[in-house]
UniProtKB/Swiss-Prot annotation:
GO terms for molecular function: dGTPase activity. SMART domains: HDc (SM00471). Belongs to the dGTPase family. Type 2 subfamily. This is Deoxyguanosinetriphosphate triphosphohydrolase-like protein. Keywords: Hydrolase. PROSITE patterns: HD (PS51831). Residues 59-252 form the HD domain. InterPro entries: dGTPase (IPR006261), dGTPase-like (IPR050135), dNTPase_2 (IPR023023), HD/PDEase_dom (IPR003607), HD_domain (IPR006674), PHydrolase_assoc_dom (IPR026875). SUPFAM superfamilies: HD-domain/PDEase-like. One of its GO terms (biological process) is dGTP catabolic process. Residues 1-28 are annotated as: Disordered. Pfam families: HD, HD_assoc. Residues 7-28 have a biased composition (Basic and acidic residues).
Amino acid sequence: MSSSVWQERRHGEDKQRRNDHRSPFQRDRARILHSAAFRRLQAKTQVLGVGMNDFYRTRLTHSLEVSQIGTGIAAQLSRKYPEHKPLLGSMSLLESLCLAHDIGHPPFGHGGEVALNYMMRHHGGFEGNGQTFRILSKLEPYTEAFGMNLCRRTMLGILKYPAPQSLLFVPGSHPEITNHRQLKPSQWPPVKGIFDDDSDIFDWVLEPLSVADRARFTSVQPSLQPNYPHLRTQFKSFDCSIMELADDIAYAVHDLEDAIVMGIVTASQWQQDVAPTLKHSGDPWIRQELADIGTKLFSHEHHLRKDAIGTLVNGFVTAIIINDDPAFEEPLLRFNASLEPEFANALNVLKQLVFKYVIRKPEIQMLEYKGQQIVMGLFEAFASDPERLLPLNTQERWRTSELQGQNSHRVLADYISGMTDEFAGRLYQQLFSPKAGSNVELSKEM
């Protein structure tokens, strides 16, 4: 497939700016970097709640680190596989994907995502990656109705789960609850796919693919995870596979660093949960470096800990390979990046360590639960009387959606998911707390 078709934008542009010689993907990167949706990541939860400590990462700093790791992966693959240099393409493309990958995630992390998914259960559901696709293609006001109007290849790369939610949803898999406070995230996992409301854009992105490629790329299968009852997609594009690896490495390594600095993960937990598994690794580098990395990670010397973090990131980045799936015709689908098996296992061990001692920590879960309640309370209030409570511009979007017979509840999810943690908490107080006073915050549209 010609590269030009992947550089096309959904809405043609005739902007001719003086002496502007940027590539299409450099323009995409600039649009993402300068967007309000990207700026709001500075006040959205990554793992540890915003306001707990000045050191830890927010979704903004996480996204910047994912971008750096993503371009590092591309540089390594370019040297390791020179024959794939044309496929790797622009560093600006990978930066765009990595910077944008979390833009759709709502306030309060997973708690906010589960809450919105529950409130949208009869209206197409909610999932952060699907919302990212929606923001980039429809909501961010770079254009009147086409969002950031990014290149087709950029939109293909952001598609982590290339299938509509209606194809993935398994009915009857969620227990109904009688009170919002009874909502358990494990019982309401979001369906990982594109919202059916955005199927027109999804179709446009996949337009260049052959019938066979599209059918295979969007195929689904039962999930192997016991707590995920819905069907799952099986494939992603080459660019997306690099972005996802960068995200996983940043999550496992950098979020672990935050937890170590704050004393949430200890050296004894490392020795108990990580060392016994990795010392038997089939890769000699992992076996040889393990003890030294463990010592430095928990050192009181800041530079030693940073050296260990750098060693871990470098170890994972240099262990990435390119796989070939000849069943696909399109090179962007035929080739995918992945970790060598021993390093994939090591990364999973680190991710499980973060999940066990950080994500599942009661104090973190209390913050997540609180966020759930805030998001559900806001949604319920706005849904009860949209033309009374929504900001004027959002009211107009809601009315337009109603008049056109579209999913007006999606407008409510768009508004709430765009909020920062602090803004959502403040708005909740103004709506429901008698002590909040009568000075309701008047702010510009989210």
